[in-house]
Regions:
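The feature marks helicase ATPase cores and/or their adjacent C-terminal helical subdomains
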Residues: 1-323
């Protein structure tokens, strides 16, 4: 209203169906009124046909209530994709929970491990965040919370993977050696050298034998092949041991030494506006909520995805999107 009063010409651009911050003062009713008669941008650029149809089905009661009719066409594959310009179809899969083995779970795990696609796990709130983190830990999946660094940094994983090769004599870059130093303890580092900064070192590869000769590493370092046994424990023992178990699972399953983490998780309010290749939606809801607010949350959750989506039914009394 302030904008309309003080400005002769103004533009409203947005999607009232994604009004999910009512608790912060957003008014869905106002946005739907503003959208009446607005130009409809018909072509979608994110969701494939399956997710597009699902989202339309989810939001239909609201469209009917406000007498809204939108075209919203499904997206095509982007430039550079092997199917560039073709309609994205996609699939909708179902998981009973995060722990039961089934064909659709195996499809998800296979896609995570054997493609370069991105995955978003999203949910309404607690306890779903615990469910999803336990799932990642169980299957040795690299993951990060949306907007944060990885649960275990790439450099930490690299140290566990590359140390045995370094101990066997393989030369490593100065960068990698500095990363080792961030974790190594007194079992291999010479006393007083734990804070060594490698100033003025030439950026090239070095062997473990060179570091031993320079009195930085102990001679017995070459016999230590397991990084878990020579690194410094950080945090509570129980948490540290769980971290090591998780790291071993990641190494066993295989991971990309470089690049971004492709699997992320967050609640629905956090992921609004983001795009991922695939989306996994947990419909658990633990308290009564306004029906239309539920539908908008569910709509936002699924519409983050391009290709495939997975649905996990509520593990509680209430289901997101059900009165």
């Amino acid at each position: 209203h302030k904008m309309a009063t003080n400005t002769k010409e103004y533009w409203f651009v947005g999607d009232p169906d994604q009004t999910i911050f009512e608790f912060a003062g957003a008014s869905a009713e106002t946005f739907y009124e503003l959208s009446k008669g607005a130009e409809d941008l018909e072509q979608g650029y994110r969701c494939g046909q399956t997710i597009n149809n699902l989202c339309k089905q989810i939001i239909k009661p609201i469209w009917d209530h406000y007498n809204i009719r939108r075209t919203w066409k499904p997206a095509n594959y982007r430039k550079g994709h092997e199917k560039e310009g073709q309609l994205i179809i996609g699939n909708h899969y179902y998981l009973p929970n995060y722990t039961t083995d089934c064909s659709h779970l195996r499809i998800l795990l296979d896609k995570i491990r054997n493609t370069e696609e991105t995955f978003l796990f999203t949910y309404r709130g607690n306890p779903s965040d615990t469910f999803v983190k336990n799932f990642f830990d169980q299957h040795g999946i690299e993951y990060a919370h949306v907007g944060n660094t990885a649960h275990v940094p790439k450099k930490e994983l690299r140290c566990h993977k590359l140390w045995p090769e370094f101990a066997n004599g393989k030369p490593m870059s100065l960068k990698q050696i500095k990363e080792f130093w961030d974790y190594l303890g007194s079992k291999v580092i010479v006393h007083g050298k734990g804070e060594y900064e490698f100033k003025d070192w030439i950026k090239k590869d070095y062997t473990i034998h060179e570091l031993i000769k320079l009195k930085l590493l102990k001679e017995t370092s070459v016999n230590e092949k397991d990084f878990r046994l020579i690194r410094v424990q950080k945090g509570k023992k129980e948490d540290y041991e769980k971290r090591l178990i998780y790291i071993e699972k990641v190494l066993r399953k295989g991971f990309n030494l470089e690049g971004d983490v492709r699997v992320r998780y967050a609640n629905i309010h956090t992921v609004k506006g983001l795009t991922f290749d695939n989306v996994i939606v947990d419909l658990t809801r633990t308290r009564p909520e306004n029906y239309f607010e539920q539908l908008r949350l569910k709509y936002v959750a699924y519409s983050r995805g391009r290709y495939d989506c997975w649905t996990i039914p509520s593990q509680s009394t209430y289901t997101l999107g059900i009165k």
